[in-house]
Design a protein with these regions (language model features):
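Transmembrane helical elements of multi-pass membrane transporters/channels
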Residues: 12-28, 133, 167, 196-200, ...
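Signature of the first transmembrane helix
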Residues: 8-69, 73, 237-257
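Small-residue-rich hydrophobic transmembrane alpha-helices
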Residues: 44-104, 141-160, 254, 268-331, ...
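Helix-terminus/linker motif at the lipid-water interface of multi-pass membrane proteins
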Residues: 26-45, 114-121, 177-184, 244-277, ...
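Short alpha-helical transmembrane segments in multi-pass integral membrane proteins
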Residues: 1-14, 72-139, 181-237, 293-358, ...
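Short runs within selected transmembrane alpha-helices of multi-pass transporters and secretion channels
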Residues: 65, 134-152, 160-168, 189-204, ...
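Residue-level hotspots within pore-lining transmembrane alpha-helices
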Residues: 19, 23, 27, 57, ...
């Protein structure tokens, strides 16, 4: 990770990341796709709204775990296995406690959450059932994501890919069982998701127990240590808050769509799933630059970290341009894969065509944010995302939802507009940092 061809390292390390994200997205889309084939619009809406809430919770957990990936990566890069073991142990202790508290709180608040989402009346009970079952599975979701963050921190991006592959296969099979054969609709989708996550965690624990490596964990590593947790949270909390804020903006946009009726509500839910596929490459590049740059920073190779940023930006922008062009020609049949309702497909296609360009702009600020994470400067990403959400994404979405009743196309423009603001801020910060290397390279 800290020697050899930088471009090859980026490609080899990012491919398992990309496949992992693809499988994780497929995992989430299976619920929506299978419910869409066997259930009605109300079931599809229940799963799309419920899965959006679960996605928000998951990305916040992943964001918090970014602190572990970065700190473990720095320790490994500096060849300090004792410090790496301490980071791993404290990560496990902290996240297991967080997951139990989160599960209890969310189970109590499930109905208020469904109400806040302005869920259409026909989909309320299905959404409640879906979320209740998924909330019970939060400890498994947390366990999978912290195990993955630990493996990636030590430079292993392949094992998490295998773990999610197991979960994905199990989820698809269980969805067909619970939804197709047993007719459980939204509740069946949630059961499949929760059980599949549990299976994945069991498999990952078996791998950990059989694995022998240079990092040895001791009981003392699991005891909370103030400085270790502080360093993890210093990076993780801003990322968690940033990702949470972004997801809240998506939820707000979903509420705007829900208020337009069942057709637009289902359309927006489906497009968000498609967008999650388009964002696989930008997301994998962000994670790649975070992990690789962290190890190189730990090894004192700052120029190599910067070169890594150059390559991930090149890959991401090229990909974004290609995808944006393709989507303009295939939007209707693409949305139609997830619904049998022609009106939903047409409505969603307009939203997707304008939204697609966000793949370019968001891709740029994703890569720069990942670079900032590696230096412990995650607060910068929180700031630029907050500004873009407050100044563009939410107000523009609201304006479009009120003044353009016949099409979702203008609503889709809000996301790339917000990302453009983030890009401007990120580039400005990067240029400033380049002129103050002596300060930020010693963080």
């Amino acid at each position: 990770m800290t020697s050899g061809s930088v471009f090859k390292t980026v490609v080899y390390f990012s491919l398992p990341y990309l496949l992992s994200y693809f499988l994780q997205t497929l995992y989430g889309m299976a619920d929506l796709f299978i419910v869409g084939q066997f259930g009605g619009v109300s079931s599809t809406t229940a799963v799309s709204i419920g899965s959006q809430i679960m996605h928000m919770i998951t990305v916040m957990i992943v964001g918090l775990a970014m602190g572990s990936t970065v700190m473990i990566g720095r320790s490994v890069g500096a060849k300090n296995n004792r410090q790496a073991a301490e980071c791993i142990g404290n990560t496990v202790t902290m996240f297991m406690g967080i997951s139990m508290v989160l599960m209890a709180v969310l189970l109590v608040l499930v109905r208020p959450i469904v109400g806040i989402m302005s869920t259409p009346a026909e989909a309320v009970e299905g959404t409640v059932r879906y979320l209740t079952i998924c909330f019970i599975g939060i400890p498994f979701i947390t366990a999978y994501n912290i195990i993955s963050s630990i493996f990636r921190g030590i430079g292993d991006s392949k094992s998490p890919m295998y773990f999610i592959a197991v979960a994905c296969a199990a989820n698809i099979g269980l969805d067909y069982l619970f939804i197709g054969l047993l007719g459980l609709d939204a509740a069946g989708a949630a059961l499949g998701t929760t059980i599949a996550q549990a299976i994945s965690v069991v498999v990952s624990l078996v791998v950990i127990l059989k694995r022998k490596g240079g990092i040895r964990l001791e009981k003392s590593d699991f005891r909370p240590k103030r400085m270790t947790m502080k360093n993890i949270l210093k990076v993780g909390v801003p990322v968690c808050l940033q990702d949470g804020f972004i997801q809240v903006s998506f939820v707000v946009i979903t509420i705007f769509a829900n208020q337009r009726g069942l057709t637009d509500a289902a359309a927006v839910g489906i497009v968000e799933k498609i967008i999650s596929i388009l964002f696989l490459v930008p997301s994998s590049m962000m994670s790649t630059i975070s992990a690789l740059a962290a190890q190189n920073i730990g090894a004192g190779k700052h120029d190599r970290a910067k070169l890594t940023l150059k390559y991930v930006l090149m890959i991401t922008v090229t990909y974004g341009l290609i995808m944006t062009i393709i989507i303009q020609f295939v939007s209707v049949p693409l949305v139609g894969l997830f619904t049998n309702d022609g009106a939903v497909a047409v409505s969603g296609a307009g939203y997707l065509r304008s939204y697609a360009s966000d793949c370019i702009f968001a891709g740029i600020h994703f890569c720069l944010s990942g670079y900032f994470y590696a230096y412990g400067l995650s607060v910068i990403s929180f700031i630029h995302n907050s500004i873009s959400i407050v100044c563009a994404r939410i107000p523009l979405s609201y304006y479009a939802s009120v003044h353009f009743k016949d099409t979702l196309f203008p609503m889709g423009c809000a996301a790339p507009a917000g990302s453009l603001i983030s890009v401007i801020i990120c580039v400005g910060v990067f240029i400033w940092l380049e002129h103050h290397e002596d300060k930020y390279q010693n963080i």
